[in-house]
């Protein structure tokens, strides 16, 4: 059930969804306090992801890793995915702070664009661009591969226009975003089970996938439970939508590390892994 305590500094909420948390409990300028600040945690995962891509990060192993990613033209793709994650967090914070429809779009549309970026990176794992087109990868040099960027852009535009035209219908985002996540999940399984290059030692791809998938699953469970069991601004005494923010932010960060792992593996690099406060980050070791 939705709760609107008062209008706050932004007037009557215009967003299509007003979440479980009671509005303007702590400040007339922040509609949903916990949901707003937990949104910024999403951005922090993106900021951390970019930080570990910087040339001055870490010791010799990390510096060599970043150098390799630049040589393989992977670093910029990774940074773009983390920038999009930062935008999702900022947009989500604006949405939950104001409960205005235009800020809801600032939250929802970057979610679609971030998923499309990750999908594109994932589909192009293992391919090389040649004078005759593309070599390797799941699509090879097929017509579909050449049309892929345009198809993804068209999907993003279609969803954007649909959401703008048909307002107050959150299921449009839920279905369109859910379809992208569904594909990413199962294409990841395909990449894990794909035959690895001869002589390649084990790498942490399966571990990273499980880490990201479980994080996403826990976050989604929090989202669903809150929608159905909200009572007096909480769900079983917790702000579960804030947990959704944390776990989905962490999942997206780790999934990007998974993609880096597969991109390196396709170029015959061994991959190592380190943790900071339980958060994994991978690094290239050497070619085999």
UniProtKB/Swiss-Prot annotation:
Pfam families the UniProt entry points to: Ceramidase (PF05875)
Principal location listed in the UniProt entry: membrane
Residues with attached carbohydrate: 23
Membrane disposition: Multi-pass membrane protein
Keyword Hydrolase annotated: yes
GO MF term (any one): N-acylsphingosine amidohydrolase activity
GO cellular component terms, semicolon-separated: endoplasmic reticulum membrane
Chain ranges passing through the membrane: 41-61, 78-98, 105-125, 146-166, 172-192, 206-226, 240-260
EC top class, as a word: hydrolase
This protein's UniProt keywords: Glycoprotein, Hydrolase, Membrane, Transmembrane, Transmembrane helix
Origin superkingdom: Eukaryota
Cell location: Membrane
EC code(s) of this entry: 3.5.1.-
GO-annotated biological processes: ceramide metabolic process
Induction trigger: Up-regulated by srfA transcription factor.
Homology family: Belongs to the alkaline ceramidase family.
Full protein name: Putative alkaline ceramidase dcd3A
Phylogenetic classification of the source organism: Eukaryota, Amoebozoa, Evosea, Eumycetozoa, Dictyostelia
